[in-house]
Regions:
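Tryptophan-centric aromatic hotspots in well-structured domains and transmembrane helices
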Residues: 16, 61-62, 100-104
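Acidic-and-aromatic substrate-binding clefts and catalytic sites of carbohydrate-active enzymes
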Residues: 35, 63-65, 90-92
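Short His-Asn-centered micro-motif
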Residues: 9, 58-64, 115-117
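C-terminal cap/substrate-recognition subdomain and adjoining C-terminal extension
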Residues: 68-155
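Active-site neighborhood of HAD-like aspartate-dependent phosphohydrolases
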Residues: 2-50
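Substrate-recognition element of Asp-dependent hydrolases with the DxDx(T/V) motif
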Residues: 51-71
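Structural motif
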Residues: 4-6, 54, 111-113
Length: 155
């Protein structure tokens, strides 16, 4: 497996404000409904399109949806712009899922950027804090400072 720059992506509070979306259960299992769900993926897709950057989802959404369903139902634009992977759902901690993914792909800290709205999730892995871009959960990546850090990482 080739070593590529990787953006680790949370979804709630990053690709949409955390006030957006409701979890419902339908005949095919869980579904997140509501206007604006994953609406900020366009901003990220524009920035990674044509770049040698992968996306690795570390969000709790990996417990509800497999990769195909995430791509088909929630992340179409982002999927068209970058290769998307999931972190290991058998690992409970977000930070441990990220360090496991990095270890398996031999990624260094310089190879990664982490987008998340919950910095406390990384208390057990202080080595990741330098790569963490904390999003305001009411804005997600719709913040000039966050977008600038993404732009700097992918350039």
């Amino acid at each position: 497996m080739s070593k590529r720059a990787t953006i680790f992506l949370d979804i709630d509070g990053v690709l949409h404000p955390n006030s957006v979306g409701e979890l419902e259960y339908g005949p095919n299992g869980p579904v997140v409904v509501g206007q604006g769900v994953c609406s900020l993926q366009t901003k990220l897709a524009e920035r990674v399109s044509g770049k040698a950057v992968d996306i690795a989802i570390h969000s709790t959404w990996i417990y509800m949806f497999d990769l195909k369903r995430l791509q088909d139902e929630y992340l179409r634009e982002l999927s068209a712009a970058a290769k998307i992977y999931l972190t290991n759902r058998r690992i409970e901690s977000r930070s441990l899922r990220i360090t496991d993914y990095m270890r398996r792909r031999r990624l260094t800290l310089a190879d990664v950027l982490i987008l998340d709205d919950a910095p406390k999730e990384f208390a057990s892995a202080p080595e990741l804090l330098s790569r963490l871009v904390v999003c305001d959960p009411t804005r997600g990546i719709d913040d000039p400072a966050v977008l600038q850090q993404i732009d700097e990482f992918v350039s």
